[in-house]
Amino acid sequence: MSKMPPSYTSTTNACKLCKPLGASLAFRGIEGAVPFLHGSQGCATYMRRYIISHFNEPIDIASSSLGEKHAVYGGSANLKLGLNNVTKKYNPQLIGVATTCLTETIGDDVKRIISEYKAEFYNGEKPCKGEKSFELGKSFKLEKSEIDKVSKRDPYIISVSTPSYSGTHIEGFHAAIKAVVEQLTEPAGLINEIHASPDDIHTLEDTFPVTALTRESVNFMPGFVSAADLRYLKEVLTDFGISFTLFPDYSESLDGEALNDYPLIPSGGTPIENIKKMGWAKITIECGSTLPKESAGTALAQMYGTPLYRTSLPIGIRETDKLMDKLEEISKREIPARYRSARGRLVDAMVDGHKYLSGKRAIVYGEEDLVVGLTSFLAEIGIKPIICASGGKSGQLNQAIANVVEGLAPLPQVYEDVDFYDIEERAESLDIDILVGHSKGYAFSRKKGVPLIRVGFPIHDRIGGQRILHLGYHGAQMLFDAITNTIIAKKQDDSPIGYSYM
């Protein structure tokens, strides 16, 4: 009798996004950068559509536009041609190249291809000797008309491996940040002022001494948060009088002002010169409870000895208190009065709204670090998290959730690497009052008949997802009001009487 194959159910309504999307978002947080996907045109189109739908901002993501023949013969020539085109048309300071499933599967050596491209193209002195395309084993060279001099200031090119089958968008986001740190930061003492010389050799005349940010600045890497969160963090650090490098910073490049003319590369982003000096900061603060062991912060610590402090996302009172205490220690200043007052108002609001929230039950889903932060906050305000779920699979979620609910709420059911089919199946017999997560849970919310509190990414069915503030006392206040009013509205709508006073 033959052995039956194991039963298998494909992913149904995934609770995660693909790895190159996260890398594209991270690269967009660098000043003058253009994200570039080495793969098929469809990958870049999908990323653009998804990001635009949430941020309501245009975003260009370049592509090497591989087709069927490149899956057989390789995409080297397309990558080189694409890099040259982006450099000529956009004049970027940096190009962030992220791989896709296709190029990882066929085995393209992206680092080698980029190295060849620099030798062939940079400073416009050497024509590209790479193969333009391949057909039946026959090679074709680039025509002279296709070879133009690139920018006078050749862009940095950062590469990162991000096949979708190896992780989620959050892993791609962190992988891109780590790649930038490893490939762009430079030793203290002398920092290169130019990008490349003809022989890629720098002399003392090409450099300048590190001064302004050396051992005085703080590296702050908050992870994947909203544009409003990034602006808030910059305000906090400024109010503490701290010189800082916030990386990545897409608070303006993905949530900018209305302009008369469309810029090819929007303003905003972490300045490249600041990134180059990150290894010589006073300390690195990295936010996240489920970060990879090998992160950008650990890379800086290993490469330059930069002290690393890790903390959870500052959502709610306890986690924000931890961050404020650390900033007090670093700045040697007391917490500014505006944040002390905001904390007091939040506590007062929690007392006022406790009668509406006590004992309510919630399902929280989304990115692992956000789920941990939201679970901590819900436990603080008297709501019992029943299920905490994520499409990520760091292996750290269960312990992180246990840490934040200890002493406040029973340990919820915690699930990693799940989709919405799994979440619905586990929640079928449970009595819940609210869902907390992104828009992809709306179908479940409608089916279950419970309201959805929209947070995180993506938010496609409401406007202003990029402006939702989650962090700090101010963010907690906004979340508290939204949750409380949603529960009141649900009770009001369900009442046959229609009370106007609750």
PLM region spans:
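An N-terminal assembly and electron-transfer interface module characteristic of large anaerobic redox
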Residues: M1-M502
